[in-house]
Amino acid sequence: MNVYLLLASGILCALMTVFWKYRRFQRNTGEMSSNSTALALVRPSSTGLINSNTDNNLSVYDLSRDILNNFPHSIAMQKRILVNLTTVENKLVELEHILVSKGFRSASAHRKST
C-alpha cells in the first residue's frame, strides 16, 4: 500500500511540475506577444476591411520607425548583432580556408601515395 501511495505522490508531483512550467512558459510568451507591436504588418482600417487600393501595409520605413519608438534600445542591440554577425562571418571564412587547405593537402598526399 505504501508503494502505491509513493507512486501516486510521485506522479502527482511530476504532473504539478509540468503544469507549473507550462503555465509559466505561456505567461512569458503571452507577455511578449501582447507587448510587441512592432510585428504588426497590417494597419487596421476604419471600417475593419482591408482594401487592396488603399495603403494598409506598413512600409519598411514605418516599421523601422515604430520599432525605434517602441524599443529605443534597439539601435544598440542592432549594432551588437551586426558586430557579432561580422565576427561569425570572419570565423566561418577562416574555417573554410582551413578546411580547403587541409582538403587539398590530403588530396595531394593521397595522389602521391597511389
Swiss-Prot record:
Signal sequence coordinates: none
Subcellular location field: Cell membrane
Recorded superkingdom: Eukaryota
Glycosylated residues, chain numbering: N84
Keyword vocabulary terms for this entry: Cell membrane, Glycoprotein, Membrane, Signal-anchor, Transmembrane, Transmembrane helix
GO terms for cellular component: plasma membrane
Topological region Cytoplasmic: 1-4
Regions crossing the membrane: 5-22
Residue spans, topological domain Extracellular: 23-114
Listed InterPro entries: KKLCAg1
Coiled coil (residue ranges): none
Membrane topology: Single-pass type II membrane protein
Protein's UniProt name: Kita-kyushu lung cancer antigen 1 homolog
Organism encoding this protein: Macaca fascicularis (Crab-eating macaque)
Taxonomy of the source species: Eukaryota, Metazoa, Chordata, Craniata, Vertebrata
